[in-house]
Regions:
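Short helix-loop-beta connector
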Residues: 80-87
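Class I SAM-dependent methyltransferase Rossmann-like catalytic core
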Residues: 49-73, 77
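A short glycine-rich, Lys/Arg-flanked "PGG" loop and its adjoining helix->strand segment in the class I
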Residues: 164-176
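Class I SAM-dependent methyltransferase SAM/SAH-binding core
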Residues: 87-89, 94-144
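A short acidic, Gly/Pro-enriched loop at the edge of an enzyme's catalytic core
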Residues: 143-154
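A short SAM/SAH-binding and catalytic strip from SAM-dependent methyltransferases
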Residues: 153-166, 181
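Conserved class I S-adenosyl-L-methionine
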Residues: 176-183
Length: 183
């Protein structure tokens, strides 16, 4: 089970309809588009990552099919590595194109995967949450993931910075990291 953590105190978050709340009563509203902002309080009010135009440009580019082969290969590999009820993080999920394919591939195995998308760009996760309403999406830094230790079966890291120590912290023993980088 995914263990989201409070970026203020580190306590475990629980979802209460449209809010995530920890035992210390810190609360984080789920936006209408379906994502929650879990960036540290010191980062509030600042723009991080891609803006609306950059996200729209990436979405338009990916919709032209140039990366369909890669998207399919990533989704197929995820389905091979993870069980049908796996806890999976798309670290640096962007606007959710890969996340959608990953979810569909895992769900096709007949299970109920728990999929989390995290990106530092609130605009990107806003779009991702609309693309994959079955997932949990948060604006968060992959350098300081708001996740409990050893809570993930698989981390997917596509064209995003590698945060090796942080990824090792949140991966379960025997978990996998699927990384895609340009050659």
């Amino acid at each position: 089970m995914l263990g989201l953590l409070c970026p203020v105190c580190g306590g475990r978050l629980a979802r209460e309809k449209t809010v995530w709340r920890c035992e210390s009563r810190h609360s984080f509203d789920v936006a209408r588009s379906g994502y929650v902002n879990l960036l540290p309080p010191s980062a509030s009010g600042k723009r991080h990552g891609d803006d609306k135009r950059m996200v729209a440009a990436r979405t338009a580019f990916l919709s032209r099919g140039y990366y369909d082969h890669l998207i399919g290969a990533v989704a197929e590999t995820c389905a091979q590595l993870a069980g049908p009820d796996a806890c999976v993080l798309d670290a640096g999920c962007g606007e959710g194109t890969y996340t959608r394919a990953i979810y569909d591939a895992l769900a096709a195995k007949g299970g109920c995967p728990q999929l989390l998308g995290a990106d530092i760009s609130a605009e990107a996760v806003r779009r991702a949450a609309r693309q994959v309403p079955e997932g949990i999406f948060c604006a968060a830094s992959t350098a300081h993931l708001p996740l409990a230790a050893e809570s993930l079966d698989l981390i997917v890291n596509i064209f995003s910075p590698l945060m090796a120590e942080e990824f090792l912290r949140v991966l379960k023993p025997g978990g996998y990291l699927l990384r895609v980088v340009p050659m």
